Amino acid sequence: MTRILLARHGETDWNREGRWQGHSDRPLNAAGLAQAEALARRMAGERIDALYTSDLARASQTAEAVRRRTGLEPIPTPGLREVDVGELAGLDRAEAARRYPDWYTRWREGTVESYPGGEQFSDLRDRALGAFDRIADRHAGQTALAVCHNGIVRAIVLHVLGLEPGARPRIAPGPNCSLTVVERQRRRLVLVALNDAGHLDGLV
């Protein structure tokens, strides 16, 4: 059995302010650093064979906290990057609704296919699943931790559950540094945990 642990990165100021980040390279804030340490303490109690991370700073900082606790060297993986939100980077929900009212309404309904000037959701899905499959193949029968982003986690969960990208609104975003666990059991993928934040008591 192969276990892939998907950890969302710790909090940034833009997370706290409700702003879209996408490929914007924002660092962790003080709360995010504390969340990363809590995740690292939990991972120190797990048997983990490999550590992967998105190459964006908020993920690599989170992975660095895990490295200090486990001794595993993070492997930067561009395929784990957050979705490119294009022209929405830095905007909060209210600003996006004012600038792109039609798009925003359809986004809330799950009927848009991309962000304005950004990545197609189908491309995000293919990228996320490609990274997931490579990690799972490389660590067959082992456990690997991948520090990534909400968009990546949701794309993988939708695939595991057999849902189309338009079902995104049905998958709640997890708190920063929450854990989602997927197991590959023979040829079947099983969602074992979604947005587990038990290690973040008092930090979310």
Spans of features found by a protein language model:
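Generic beta-sheet signal
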Residues: 4, 142-148
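Loop-to-helix element that buttresses phosphate recognition and phosphoryl-transfer chemistry
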Residues: 8-66, 116-129
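Active-site metal-binding loops of divalent metal-dependent hydrolases
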Residues: 10, 150, 197
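Glycine-rich phosphate-binding loop signature in dinucleotide/nucleotide-binding domains
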Residues: 44-47, 135-142
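Short glycine/proline- and acidic residue-enriched helix-loop micro-motifs
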Residues: 103-123
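Domain-level recognition of soluble alpha/beta enzyme cores
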Residues: 164-188
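Acidic, His/Gly-rich catalytic cores of divalent-metal-dependent hydrolytic chemistry
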Residues: 192-204
